A protein has these predicted regions:
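Metal-dependent phosphoester-hydrolase catalytic domains
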Residues: 47, 56, 98-109, 117-197
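Active-site glycine-centered loops adjacent to acidic/histidine catalytic or metal-binding residues
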Residues: 71, 113-114
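A long, amphipathic alpha-helix that forms part
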Residues: 80-105
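A short secondary-structure junction signal
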Residues: 34-36, 77-82, 123
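Second-shell loop/turn segments in exported
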Residues: 10-11, 41-43, 76-86, 111-113, ...
Length: 197
């Protein structure tokens, strides 16, 4: 990517495992304006996790694009026990988007990343409802056998989501998973394919 001229911005999160969140972009089609991180509030029962990355930039035809990149708290300990942590992320994100819309009501917004939740789970539903975003990836699939973004014990699932403001959804014809053949491998135990790891 570096040889192709791509650049990146990255958080410096307090994540206990040292994991950060980044956005890779081409400066030929996205002129960076600003980037900041939103740290999730800490609590005694939640270890330090990844920040939400906010990036703004001007795209080639002159509109400003506002991108939030998410890597939500994991499901360690089980979905139900860890759900409150992802709800904290959802509330933090919604507050950030509300603040942006106070300044720019018609902002072009993309929220993308690993939500560690499915499209129908509480945190994703809250974000879509409260921040008035549409999940364009809820029914995405690939062209070479991928039915979602990961496969575990033969079952497909998508914890990765792409959410858009309504002014951008009108521009989207479809959303699909990039499952180029070199990104897949044979699932020898359950049949079919799975993402190469």
């Amino acid at each position: 990517l570096r040889k192709a001229g791509y650049q990146y911005v990255m958080t410096n999160s307090g994540d206990a495992r040292g994991i950060d969140v980044a956005l890779v972009y081409s400066p030929m089609s996205f002129a960076l304006i600003n980037h900041i991180s939103f740290r999730l509030p800490s609590s005694p029962d939640m270890r330090a996790t990844r920040d939400i990355l906010y990036v703004s930039g001007v795209i080639s035809h002159g509109d400003t694009l506002h991108v939030y990149v998410v890597h939500a708290p994991s499901r360690v300990g089980g979905e139900r026990q860890s759900r409150p942590h992802r709800m904290v992320m959802a509330a933090t994100l919604c507050t950030a988007i509300d603040s942006l819309r106070d300044i720019s009501p018609e902002a072009n917004i993309i929220v993308a990343g690993d939500f560690n939740d499915y499209a129908t789970d509480s945190a994703v539903v809250k974000i879509c409802r409260d921040a008035r975003l549409m999940n364009i990836s809820a029914h995405a699939y690939g062209q070479n056998g991928a039915k979602a973004t990961y496969r575990y014990k033969g079952e497909w699932g998508s914890l990765d989501q792409i959410l858009l403001s309504s002014n951008l959804t009108a521009l989207v014809e479809s959303c699909r998973i990039n499952d180029a053949p070199f990104l897949l491998e044979e699932d020898k135990k359950y049949g079919g394919v799975l993402p190469r790891r």
